[in-house]
């Protein structure tokens, strides 16, 4: 077999001691990520406040603001996104690290989606019972506003004083949309009116803006009692004088609209609605599948899951009636009392399931979040319409991950409770989102989800977590619990059918309810088209990739390694997830091919090289490079390569170990200029070398020759 020989020079990466003024380094894509994200946060002050992105006086300004969400403010954000896309395109992907390249692709996808989505903004009414301003403003302050110090409490009161102005912004936008006949169906408007009336039905002192504020100040224990009462009284006064009148103005706008509206539910009812729905499906599933294709996938999965459920119901002796009738009877038999004692009992069970899940997860995960997770019920005014949800922990540790559950009657059952907790907490959303926040390898915009999340992967992972718990024996001999897990999966499969039915096939609200989806869920799909499809489409992709990994690796497959691969990808579109898993499979195949007893140590090189060294040997088991970077390697035809290190490289490896130990002196006899600054090694496990290729200098006097022969390991780019 032909032998290929090429020459590169290698320098150990240590501090610069150059003579004279060093050249100014070129701006990197990582610099762009940092600067653009800061600009993005300044354009989105509510996000800056919730994540505590800045510090000092600048952060204080954001924490005192309640930013507007108007057509004008959104236009400024779109202009910033377009500017970001233009600048991002100036960076050469071939000069990026793997993480940088994926981050650039993710940012490009997110900014393009935001820009495209703004033209469909008129299809989103600003007042509705699930994600309207009337819901988001209370959630922003009562849950997400940082509240640790007395200054935080003062900022809360300052922002509360701006709530009425933000509600008036929403009313003005809603009035403009109504003039174009762009408003929700009658049943959505009526439900929103009921919810808004309920929000202002209590005395101001009992309103969530006041009670949650008082409770959080008390929990923080940093605000003196007298000052705490003073601030609470200020909040109560603002709610009475400003917030309640603003809510009444919103209700006054909606009431006549409810008289004008009909019950047509889907986007098809609007001009351009079909295009808007196609965009929604692309946004939420990150695929190009049509509504019809997704509808058919849903029908197939519904039939499969119903057959499996029927078998378990028969084992439980429930043979009479339709599947839905038998499930309802079982669900009712496991209901909690609709009393305060019942509410306490369900929350106690949630806590037990959550902590038990944390213990069991150690068998499937070797990487778990540091941030804690807590569970709490929704405030009463949200119970009728809210879906169970997870809120990420604060990056500074001031707020844990939070699971909120609505304690309305249909949720007060043990039947699906275990599955719900697994989805929202451990090993579901809390594992994925908190681990992403804690991953130092990711740029900050990804750790904080500054540009938003990716529903297909987030919700797909949550649904996968439900299934994983069932597959792993977490339900033990609990047949009712296993049935509940299948019922929740059936629910997500029906969502594919119902969401596409409503928005592409002219289904009515009642048709969707008759198909097996409760009314409040149907209404959520009406106001948030496409999102319900993200769950199962994401889960199916994860399961497909897991099956691929099992077939590729055989008895070398490790569920922990697979989960590491998926979770380390961060929140990305499904095609990028697949590329990450493919890279893991190539690497795992390399490891599996090693002789017994030999292991590998990963080494991450700057700017864009990654290698796997066999521990205790001089083999480079894997070298990864960006496409087209001929300065690092020559094109070759052999699919498998073996690289033999020269003696000089072995000395460099020793030097790398010394540098990582904090010494950094070159080995005896080494000559030449000091290497360039700026490189760094992200080195898990044992100390290993940090080296980089350069075309201008060598740490050693002699050049280093790599002799490549046909033998062992391929050279490839891990994400392409």
Located regions from the model:
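N-terminal maturation segment of proteins
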Residues: 19-593
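Histidine-centered metal-chelating micro-motifs
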Residues: 629-631, 682-709
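Ligand-binding loop in jelly-roll beta-barrel domains
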Residues: 647, 701-719
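Short beta-strand segments in beta-sandwich/barrel cores
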Residues: 620, 630-632, 648-652, 697
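A short glycine-rich, His/Asp/Glu-containing loop-to-beta-strand
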Residues: 605-633, 637-642
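Glycine- and acidic-residue-biased ligand/ion/polar-headgroup-sensing regions
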Residues: 636-659, 664, 678-685
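Bacterial N-terminal signal peptides
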Residues: 5-15
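Compositionally biased, proline/threonine/alanine/serine-rich low-complexity intrinsically disordered stretches
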Residues: 14-24, 589-596, 663-681
């Amino acid at each position: 077999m032909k032998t290929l020989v090429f020459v590169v020079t290698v320098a150990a990466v240590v501090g610069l001691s150059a003579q004279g003024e060093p050249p100014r380094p070129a701006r990197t894509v990582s610099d762009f990520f940092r600067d653009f994200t800061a600009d993005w946060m300044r354009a989105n002050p509510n996000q800056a406040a919730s994540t505590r992105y800045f510090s000092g006086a600048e952060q204080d300004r954001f924490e005192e603001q309640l930013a507007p969400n108007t057509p004008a403010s959104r236009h400024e954000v779109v202009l910033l996104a377009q500017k970001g896309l233009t600048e991002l395109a100036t960076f050469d992907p071939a000069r990026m690290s793997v993480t940088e390249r994926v981050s650039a692709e993710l940012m490009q996808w997110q900014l393009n989606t935001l820009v495209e989505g703004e033209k469909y903004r008129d299809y989103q009414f600003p007042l509705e019972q699930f994600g309207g301003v009337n819901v988001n403003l209370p959630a922003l302050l009562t849950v997400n506003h940082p509240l640790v110090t007395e200054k935080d409490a003062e900022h809360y009161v300052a922002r509360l004083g701006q709530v009425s102005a933000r509600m008036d912004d929403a009313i003005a936008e809603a009035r403009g949309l109504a003039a174009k006949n762009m408003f929700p169906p009658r049943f959505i408007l009526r439900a929103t009116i009921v919810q808004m009336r309920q929000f202002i039905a209590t005395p101001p002192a009992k309103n969530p803006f006041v009670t949650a504020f008082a409770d959080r100040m008390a929990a923080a224990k940093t605000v003196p009692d007298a000052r705490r009462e003073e601030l609470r009284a200020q909040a109560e006064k603002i709610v009475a004088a400003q917030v309640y009148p603003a809510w009444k103005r919103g209700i006054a706008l909606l009431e006549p609209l409810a008289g004008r509206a009909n019950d047509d539910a889907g986007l098809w009812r609007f001009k351009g609605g079909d295009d808007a729905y196609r965009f929604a499906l692309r946004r939420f599933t990150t695929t190009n599948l049509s509504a019809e294709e997704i509808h058919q996938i849903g029908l197939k999965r519904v039939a499969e899951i119903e057959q499996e459920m029927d078998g378990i119901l028969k084992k439980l002796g429930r043979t009479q009636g339709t599947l839905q009738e038998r499930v309802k009877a079982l669900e009712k038999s496991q209901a909690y009392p609709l009393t305060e004692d019942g509410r306490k009992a369900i929350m106690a069970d949630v806590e037990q399931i959550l902590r038990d899940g944390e213990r069991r997860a150690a068998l499937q995960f070797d990487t778990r979040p540091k941030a804690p997770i807590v569970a709490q019920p929704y405030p009463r005014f949200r119970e009728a319409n809210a879906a169970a949800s997870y809120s990420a922990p604060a990056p500074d540790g001031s707020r844990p991950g939070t699971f909120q559950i609505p304690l309305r009657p249909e949720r007060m059952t043990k039947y699906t409770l275990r599955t719900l907790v697994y989805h929202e907490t451990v090993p579901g959303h809390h594992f994925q989102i908190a681990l992403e926040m804690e991953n130092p390898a990711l740029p900050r915009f990804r750790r904080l989800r500054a540009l938003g999340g990716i529903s297909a992967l987030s919700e797909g992972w949550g649904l996968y977590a439900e299934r994983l718990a069932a597959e792993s024996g977490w339900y033990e001999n609990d047949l009712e619990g296993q049935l509940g897990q299948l019922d929740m999966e059936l629910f997500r499969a029906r969502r594919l059918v119902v969401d596409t039915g409503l928005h592409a096939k002219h289904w009515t609200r009642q048709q969707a309810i008759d198909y097996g989806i409760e009314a409040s869920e149907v209404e959520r799909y009406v106001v948030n088209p496409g999102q319900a499809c993200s769950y199962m489409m994401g889960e199916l992709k994860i399961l497909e990739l897991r099956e691929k990994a099992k077939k590729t690796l055989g008895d070398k497959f490790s569920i922990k390694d697979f989960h590491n691969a998926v979770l380390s990808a961060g929140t990305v579109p499904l095609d990028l997830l697949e590329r990450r898993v493919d890279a893991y499979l190539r690497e795992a195949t390399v490891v599996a091919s090693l002789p017994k007893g030999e292991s590998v140590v990963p080494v991450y090189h700057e700017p864009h090289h990654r290698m796997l060294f066999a521990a205790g040997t001089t083999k480079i088991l894997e070298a990864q490079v960006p496409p087209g970077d001929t300065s690092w390697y020559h094109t070759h035809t052999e699919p498998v390569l073996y690289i033999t290190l020269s003696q000089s490289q072995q000395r460099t490896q020793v030097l790398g170990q010394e540098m990582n130990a904090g010494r950094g002196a070159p080995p005896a006899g080494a000559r030449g200029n000091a290497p360039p600054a700026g490189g760094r090694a992200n080195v898990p496990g044992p100390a290993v070398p940090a080296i980089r290729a350069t075309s201008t200098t060598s740490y050693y006097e002699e050049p280093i020759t790599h002799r490549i022969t046909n033998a062992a390991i391929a050279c490839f780019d891990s994400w392409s």
